[in-house]
Amino acid sequence: MSAVNQANYAALIRRYFAACNAGDHAALLSCFTPDAVHYFPAGLPDIPWRTAETIAAKWVWCVENLGSQWTIEKILVSHDSHEAVIEWTHWKGKLGTALRGDEWYVFDEQSGLIKEIRAYYASPADKEVAINELVDFDYTGRGYNLEPANAHTKSGAAK
């Protein structure tokens, strides 16, 4: 694994948010690998957003149609993996609303660009599904737990 440059990754996230706020399509593209994916919880149309082009176009649309602006509340960059997590607020000026959430970033080791974002935010649980999770994210392939740790014990209590 190549060395992790925490300052560069934090600066890239800030540059990404500045490009979002400016609705700058070219600047947004420059933050991502061409095949980047942005995952979201259920409720938005056409998710996940696949490719840098799609991600850039969707954020420009939000700025133009919703009056979107974002603030970064916190950034935490890993010291031993090419990942980061942030807290943000998405201000929807034309709607007079805001949404708070977190995002998990995965960076491409060679280019240093964003290759994946997983968004988690304050939204109501969907009572129609057994597990509320990101749409089309490969939880199984990534090794996530698919049931509680104590699911196989007789009483349900941890051993």
Where does each model-flagged region fall?
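Hydrophobic pocket/interface hotspot
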Residues: Y16, L28-L29, A36, T51, ...
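Small-side-chain structural scaffolding
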Residues: A19-A22, A36, P41, A84, ...
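A solvent-exposed, acidic/Ser-Thr-rich amphipathic alpha-helical stretch
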Residues: H25-S81
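A beta-strand edge to alpha-helix "cap/lid" segment located at domain peripheries
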Residues: A3, N8, V60-K159
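Short, mixed-charge, low-aromatic patches
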Residues: A10-A19, A42-G43, K58-C62, P148-A151
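Short acidic-aromatic low-complexity motifs
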Residues: S2-C31, D35
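Hydrophobic alpha-helical segments, principally membrane-spanning helices and signal/leader peptides
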Residues: N8-Y9, A36, A52, L95
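Alpha-helix C-capping/helix-to-loop hinge sites
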Residues: Y16-A19, Y39, Q69, W91
